[in-house]
Amino acid sequence: MSVPIPGIKDISKLKFFYGFKYLWNPTVYNKIFDKLDLTKTYKHPEELKVLDLYPGVGIQSAIFYNKYCPRQYSLLEKRSSLYKFLNAKFEGSPLQILKRDPYDWSTYSNLIDEERIFVPEVQSSDHINDKFLTVANVTGEGSEGLIMQWLSCIGNKNWLYRFGKVKMLLWMPSTTARKLLARPGMHSRSKCSVVREAFTDTKLIAISDANELKGFDSQCIEEWDPILFSAAEIWPTKGKPIALVEMDPIDFDFDVDNWDYVTRHLMILKRTPLNTVMDSLGHGGQQYFNSRITDKDLLKKCPIDLTNDEFIYLTKLFMEWPFKPDILMDFVDMYQTEHSG
């Protein structure tokens, strides 16, 4: 059964978008899905379950369903005007519209464990789960903290990531994408990009302003070759550009709690060289790390310049430190660096 696709005339009548933005042009969506080549991962899309968070006007939802005909497609949308719009447009369709809040953690335990409305298949972590996909639109202001929480869930293998390596297609402001995808040494490098690099393989798939590409690593842009579209193809048209990223969890082999402590404290002072910043990990830290780090060039680096492997190396040394502090007694705000420029 084909699902009707809302048009620009339909969505332009809506008054409230709650600060979020949505691509409306089906032609661009088709280019995006061709680029993603999702059937490589989901060889049997008829067995796929899709959880759509903040679907808004549902254009992407309808196009996705018509293209892949998944076994189950559930939309979590609590915002009043958008929920009413979805119900009116998709009444009687195979799309499952649920008035639930994607921001509320209890939504998922209720949906999956208690009511069993949406129950994904648990798969081993040696591959991307080929029967469960998550898509989300967090293009509103202040979404960065939520993305950080989701990234942390990948590291802790909880929330939706207890079902294995679950791919996520994520719309966000282009400024957030730039910070998320920043490489070592870039001005926008932050704890957000450090976490992303440690736990995921994330690619820029599409963006609504070519000028925004200047803020990304040029080699990465050449590799990703993102689809470009115009502000006229998103609604509402005013405001910041938006971007789509593809996020795949990856393997990692380090102690997450100790790694989080080390990266969090160092990134707060991200432009201070290691040869003077290590006391931030605990009293006596500078003397200890100076004696243990054999590569003296590493000591000249600032946290903003460190690679994922270098953070893991420092975490290993931290765990071997006889006088390391009790990380469970740490009360530093994990998002402090995300608002520190």
Curated annotation (Swiss-Prot):
EC numbers: 2.1.1.-
Any one of the GO CC terms: mitochondrial matrix
Keyword Nucleotidyltransferase tagged: no
GO molecular function: DNA binding; methyltransferase activity; mitochondrial transcription factor activity; RNA binding
Superkingdom per UniProt: Eukaryota
Residues engaged in binding S-adenosyl-L-methionine: 23, 77, 101, 137
Keyword Transcription: yes
Main location: mitochondrion
SUPFAM superfamilies in alphabetical order: S-adenosyl-L-methionine-dependent methyltransferases (SSF53335)
Family under the similarity heading: Belongs to the class I-like SAM-binding methyltransferase superfamily. rRNA adenine N(6)-methyltransferase family.
Protein's job: Mitochondrial transcription factor that confers selective promoter recognition on the core subunit of the yeast mitochondrial RNA polymerase. Interacts with DNA in a non-specific manner.
Protein name per the record: Mitochondrial transcription factor 1
Gene name linked to the record: MTF1
